[in-house]
Amino acid sequence: MLSPKRTRFRKHHRGRMKGISYRGNSICFGRYAIQALEPAWITSRQIEAGRRAMTRNARRGGKIWVRIFPDKPVTLRPTETRMGSGKGSPEYWVAVVKPGRILYEMSGVAENIARKAISIAASKMPIRTQFITSG
């Protein structure tokens, strides 16, 4: 699963996801892509599940690019812990995704195979997505 090798700070603020994505919203590498339509935190497990689903469906041939990276740590407190005594320890990593962001790209396969693979990957995501092709 994806996670940063090292970070400047161990814990982050939660932040808020307002507006649309101005970066990473156009197809750069492949021919087909999956684009987010809603804001969400996507965990490294979800990213990996989507990537595996795509590679399994586009068997032999085809190249896949993952365009998001989980660089935000999410902290959790131990269960049944009283309030206070600081922030919890980092448990998992998420990628902050805004509407319009490209999640995965794909090329080297027929469009119907790409559609099928991307729809299966989309079912692993916690948000609504759309299939797009490069002009």
UniProtKB/Swiss-Prot annotation:
<dbReference type="GO" id="GO:0009507">
    <property type="term" value="C:chloroplast"/>
</dbReference>
<comment type="subunit">
    <text>Part of the 50S ribosomal subunit.</text>
</comment>
<dbReference type="InterPro" id="IPR000114">
    <property type="entry name" value="Ribosomal_uL16_bact-type"/>
</dbReference>
<comment type="similarity">
    <text>Belongs to the universal ribosomal protein uL16 family.</text>
</comment>
<keyword id="KW-0934">Plastid</keyword>
<dbReference type="InterPro" id="IPR036920">
    <property type="entry name" value="Ribosomal_uL16_sf"/>
</dbReference>
<dbReference type="GO" id="GO:0006412">
    <property type="term" value="P:translation"/>
</dbReference>
<protein>
    <recommendedName>
        <fullName>Large ribosomal subunit protein uL16c</fullName>
    </recommendedName>
</protein>
<dbReference type="GO" id="GO:0019843">
    <property type="term" value="F:rRNA binding"/>
</dbReference>
<keyword id="KW-0150">Chloroplast</keyword>
<keyword id="KW-0689">Ribosomal protein</keyword>
<dbReference type="Pfam" id="PF00252">
    <property type="entry name" value="Ribosomal_L16"/>
</dbReference>
<dbReference type="GO" id="GO:0003735">
    <property type="term" value="F:structural constituent of ribosome"/>
</dbReference>
<dbReference type="GO" id="GO:1990904">
    <property type="term" value="C:ribonucleoprotein complex"/>
</dbReference>
<dbReference type="InterPro" id="IPR020798">
    <property type="entry name" value="Ribosomal_uL16_CS"/>
</dbReference>
<keyword id="KW-0687">Ribonucleoprotein</keyword>
<dbReference type="InterPro" id="IPR047873">
    <property type="entry name" value="Ribosomal_uL16"/>
</dbReference>
<dbReference type="GO" id="GO:0005840">
    <property type="term" value="C:ribosome"/>
</dbReference>
<dbReference type="InterPro" id="IPR016180">
    <property type="entry name" value="Ribosomal_uL16_dom"/>
</dbReference>
